């Protein structure tokens, strides 16, 4: 008697079950290093696929841009409205060394500044630093009520807006063209450029909330690793301070003199 197939038996699926592999076994972590102009030097970690054959892990890291809040970089909550962009330029061991790549203010900060009854004035210009970085800087300002003003609104005239915008452009060019990029970044943090604009435009029309809204890097010079490492190494002045010698106690001097006599 011929034995046929038993149709009641369950059929197996083609291929069977696939092995579940953990994706993170093929990845590795790298530390992110910020330049010395910021207080927090290790600002995070980044993930990248491990080196497989000719495909190096470092190639996947170079050129990555990280957006970090300035409050986290300087441990100051008053600077939480600014965002800094840092670009990974060089990797040593498991450390990624970054450089400044841009700046912007948060959307909620910008929305909180715009109000009815005030004129918004914005100016921008392309500048070049001493170390051949080409930047585009955007400055923003708002009109302010004059002292003892009874009028509820404070709108500036078109001629006044043009004069203020010209002043903005001139000050931004003057401040950026005479310094290195690292010194210019130090000016962005305390808003020294915005304060200078507010001071010089006071005669045209009183201003308030003058700040650098955005900074774009249009062109960067060829990477110089020695200059990049200078940004990440502390200078000799910061390395250590002289400590005053403490006066020797009377008990110690008495013991020493007694030992010398014997």
Swiss-Prot record:
Q: What keywords sit in the KW lines? A: Cytoplasm, Ribonucleoprotein, Ribosomal protein
What Pfam families does this protein map onto?
Ribosomal_S3Ae (PF01015)
Example of a GO biological process term: translation
Descriptive protein name: Small ribosomal subunit protein eS1
Q: Where is it located?
A: Cytoplasm
InterPro entries noted in UniProt: Ribosomal_eS1 (IPR001593), Ribosomal_eS1_euk (IPR027500)
Q: Where's it mainly located?
A: cytoplasm
Q: Which family does it belong to?
A: Belongs to the eukaryotic ribosomal protein eS1 family.
Q: Which GO terms describe its cellular component?
A: cytosolic small ribosomal subunit
Q: How does it assemble?
A: Component of the small ribosomal subunit. Mature ribosomes consist of a small (40S) and a large (60S) subunit. The 40S subunit contains about 33 different proteins and 1 molecule of RNA (18S). The 60S subunit contains about 49 different proteins and 3 molecules of RNA (25S, 5.8S and 5S).
- An example molecular function term from Gene Ontology annotations: structural constituent of ribosome
């Amino acid at each position: 008697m011929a034995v046929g197939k038993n149709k009641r038996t369950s059929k197996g699926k083609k291929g069977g079950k696939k092995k579940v592999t953990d994706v993170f076994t093929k990845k590795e972590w790298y530390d992110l290093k910020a330049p010395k102009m910021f207080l927090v030097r290790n600002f995070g970690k980044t993930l990248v696929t491990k080196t497989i054959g000719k495909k190096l892990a470092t190639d996947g890291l170079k050129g990555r841009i990280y957006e970090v809040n300035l409050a986290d970089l300087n441990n100051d909550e008053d600077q939480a409205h600014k965002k800094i962009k840092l670009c990974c330029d060089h990797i040593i061991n498991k450390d990624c060394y970054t450089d400044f790549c841009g700046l912007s203010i948060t959307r909620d900060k910008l929305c909180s500044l715009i109000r009815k009854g005030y004129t918004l004035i914005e100016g921008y210009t392309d500048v070049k630093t001493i170390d051949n970085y080409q930047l585009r800087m955007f400055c923003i300002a708002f009109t302010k009520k004059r002292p003892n003003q009874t009028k509820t609104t404070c709108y500036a005239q078109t001629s006044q807006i043009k004069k203020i915008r010209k002043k903005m452009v001139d000050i931004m060019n003057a401040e950026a063209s005479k310094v290195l990029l690292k010194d210019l970044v130090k000016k962005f943090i305390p808003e020294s450029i915005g304060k200078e604009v507010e001071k010089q435009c006071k005669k045209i029309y009183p201003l308030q909330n003058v700040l650098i809204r955005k900074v774009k890097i249009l062109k960067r010079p060829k990477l110089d690793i020695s200059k990049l490492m200078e940004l990440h190494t502390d200078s000799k002045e910061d390395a250590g301070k002289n400590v005053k010698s403490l006066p020797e106690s009377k008990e110690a001097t008495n013991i020493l003199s007694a030992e010398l006599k014997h």
